[in-house]
Amino acid sequence: MSYYAFEGLIPVVHPDAFVHPSAVLIGDVIVGAGVYIGPLASLRGDYGRLILEAGSNLQDGCIMHGYCDTDTIVHENGHIGHGAILHGCVVGRDALVGMNSVIMDGAVIGEESIVAAMSFVKAGFQGEARQLLVGSPARVLRQVTDQELHWKRLNTKEYQDLAIRCRTGLSETKPLTQAEENRPRLKGTTDVKPKSAQ
C-alpha cells in the first residue's frame, strides 16, 4: 500500500478495511470498517478531508479529492464504480455512483440513489433520497425501484465480502505460462447477476 503523510496528517485505515497495494492514500483520509479500495484508486487528502464510511467501496481507478475546508464523503454502504471521480461532494448512505461518472464540488447524492454510468453531476446539485440520475449533465429520471435497490445492495455486499476475501486470499504471484486443465472458476457470495441477465 502507498500511504503518505502530508504536512503532519497521516491516513487512517480501519484494520477491517482492504486497500489494494496499488492504491494511493495521501494525508487527510479516513477509511472505515469493511471498506474495499480497489487497484489504482487515488485518495488525495492534500486539501480537503476524504472519508469512506463503513461498508463502502471505491473501485479500480477511482479518484477522490476536494478543496480546503471541505469534506468529500462516501457514507455507509456507498458504492463507487470503476473509474468514477468524486470531487468535494457527498454520496449518501447506500447510494451507488456508476462507472466513469463524475460528481462535482458541493453536489449531494441522496441516500439510496443511483447515478448511472458515465453521468456528470454538476457542482452544487442537491439530490434527494432514491433518485435515479442519468446523463451529462445528469438529470433526475425517476425514483429508484425496490428491485434496483435490492440489486445495488447485493453488489455492495459482494464488495464487503471481497474486502474480507482479499485480506486473506490475495497474494502477489508469478503468472502461469498456460491455463491448467479444468481450471476452476471463482464464485461470488451472493446470487447477484449483471443487469443484462435480469
Curated annotation (Swiss-Prot):
Q: Which Gene3D superfamilies does the entry mention? A: Hexapeptide repeat proteins
Organism's domain of life? Bacteria
**This protein's UniProt keywords:** Repeat, Transferase
**InterPro entries under this entry?**
CaiE, Hexapep, Transf_Hexapept/Carb_Anhydrase, Trimer_LpxA-like_sf
Q: Where is this region: Disordered?
A: 174-198
Q: A Pfam family this protein belongs to?
A: Hexapep
Where does the sequence pass through the membrane? none
Pathway annotation: Amine and polyamine metabolism; carnitine metabolism
- Asked if the Swiss-Prot or TrEMBL record annotates the protein with the keyword Repeat, the reply is yes
Q: Which GO terms describe its molecular function?
A: transferase activity
Gene Ontology biological process terms in this record: carnitine metabolic process
Q: Which CDD domains match?
A: LbH_paaY_like (cd04745)
Q: Which family does it belong to?
A: Belongs to the transferase hexapeptide repeat family.
Cited PANTHER family: DYNACTIN SUBUNIT P25 (PTHR13061), GAMMA CARBONIC ANHYDRASE-LIKE 1, MITOCHONDRIAL-RELATED (PTHR13061:SF29)
What exactly does this protein do?
Overproduction of CaiE stimulates the activity of CaiB and CaiD.
Task: Please report the name of this protein according to its UniProt entry.
Answer: Carnitine operon protein CaiE
Q: What is the lineage of its organism?
A: Bacteria, Pseudomonadati, Pseudomonadota, Gammaproteobacteria, Enterobacterales
